[in-house]
Amino acid sequence: MRKTLFSGVALAAVIAFGGSAWADVLVGIGIPVTGPNAVYGAQIQKGAEAAIKEVNDAGGINGEKIAITIGDDVSDPKQGISVANKFAADGVKFVIGHFNSGVTIPASQVYAENGILEISPGATNPQYTEQGLWNTFRTCGRDDQQGTVAGQYIFDHFKDAKIAVVHDKTPYGQGLADETKKKLNELGTKETLYEGVNVGEKDFSALIAKLKQAGVNVVYWGGLHPEAGLIIRQMADQGLKAQFISGDGIVSNELASIAGPAVEGTLNTFGPDPRNNPDNAELVKKFRDAGFEPEAYTLYSYAAVQSLAQAAKAAGSNDPQEVAKAMKEKGPFKTVLGDLSYDEKGDPKLPGYVMYKWEKGADGKYNYIQQ
């Protein structure tokens, strides 16, 4: 029999679609269910579902149970707007999502116009919370923070290196690459190459030839794991021995599946891993017993629901405007990420980014290990 953590939440989702009055508060989960970033969508969905089940088991929020509805944005901005409009039409009050910054930013504007509060576990582009909207929150950090850490690390550890900054032309990828480049330039280091590639590209031979010709020995990648894995593998196949460094867009075990053994030694920034917090040991075990590894954004999504529920309780209301006000004024909230507070923009007060290295474990599998 297949184990599951989420039977109660699955029932709530069915009821929500069926139009029953069982649940009074409808939460939308806007994620890439399909497409190249579906692995991150699964993380966000599993985390939110588990946290919602915990909230419902404790009586819901202000006496009202939570139901969920899921929208597949396919990591596409236009589809994200369609999902946002559908959520608004369905009476969604709160959204957990989206993942991609390029989807989250335009969707947030639809939500603001329709009185919906949004908490993103993965949108790191600063613009998301710099729009001056009342409804934008995130449980992750920002690329101006992450890029600063990456740029300083490269400067400190790869002096006199020839550095290529490569990005995927998206608000997330190019935004992160530009923040890293900005920090390097502030420190007096000029990149050797600055290149953009297209999302979905498969053959990076021309890029790698250019990197080799320029004598590049450090490649910083602003983008996600599908392209990163191919670049890493093709660099190895074509004899380019350069250190590959990236950000939180490659924190999926799928990276190792795509890159193969060449992934070993890859570096990336991300927040401190909440799986390593002893306070989360029981929860992490529940996920693993159900056959799901709660990596990357799983617990960031869980914390989003925890913040929402506690803010609603503090506000004494499930009205999104009142909850948004409480999120900014009534913290900190007890979450799997620790005590979490939000500033006036909706950005969280979190520990800084740290560096991870991809290494082969005793089980023969590659994983990212905090340095």
From Swiss-Prot:
Residues annotated as signal peptide: 1-23
InterPro entries given in the database record: Leu-bd (IPR028081), Leu_Ile_Val-bd (IPR000709), Peripla_BP_I (IPR028082)
GO annotation, biological process: amino acid transport
UniProt entry tagged with the keyword Coiled coil: no
Domain of life of the organism encoding this protein: Bacteria
Recorded family membership: Belongs to the leucine-binding protein family.
PANTHER family: AMINO ACID BINDING PROTEIN, LEU/ILE/VAL-BINDING ABC TRANSPORTER SUBUNIT
Role played: Component of an amino-acid transport system.
Protein name: Leu/Ile/Val-binding protein homolog 1
Source organism per UniProt: Brucella melitensis biotype 1 (strain ATCC 23456 / CCUG 17765 / NCTC 10094 / 16M)
